[in-house]
């Protein structure tokens, strides 16, 4: 059982984020092959909750951001 204050603090740092749509699409998919090169994961831009633009240069600092999906 988690205290409500600790749960709010944890969700602030882990769940209350914005995700860049362009950076998220460009991430490679995980495939069941055994090569390490395929399984490398490029992190998408996880932005602060009030972000309006992405911080990454690869997507051109786009303003296509969405809220991170909530846990069930």
Curated annotation (Swiss-Prot):
Give the source's domain of life in one word: Eukaryota
Listed under GO biological process in this entry are: translation
Kindly name one Pfam family recorded for this protein.
Ribosomal_L40e
Under the GO molecular function aspect, what terms does this record hold?
Answer: structural constituent of ribosome
Q: Name one GO cellular component term.
A: ribosome
Give the keywords, sorted. Ribonucleoprotein, Ribosomal protein
Q: Which Gene3D superfamilies match?
A: 4.10.1060.50
What more the UniProt record tells us is:
This ribosomal protein is synthesized as a C-terminal extension protein (CEP) of ubiquitin.
Family the UniProt entry places it in: Belongs to the eukaryotic ribosomal protein eL40 family.
Descriptive protein name: Large ribosomal subunit protein eL40
């Amino acid at each position: 059982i988690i205290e409500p204050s600790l749960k709010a603090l944890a969700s602030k740092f882990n769940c209350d984020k914005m995700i860049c749509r362009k950076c998220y699409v460009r991430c490679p998919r995980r495939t069941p092959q055994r090569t390490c090169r395929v399984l490398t994961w490029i992190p998408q831009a996880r932005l602060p909750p009030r972000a309006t633009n992405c911080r990454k240069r690869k997507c051109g600092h786009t303003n296509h951001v969405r809220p991170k999906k909530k846990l069930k």
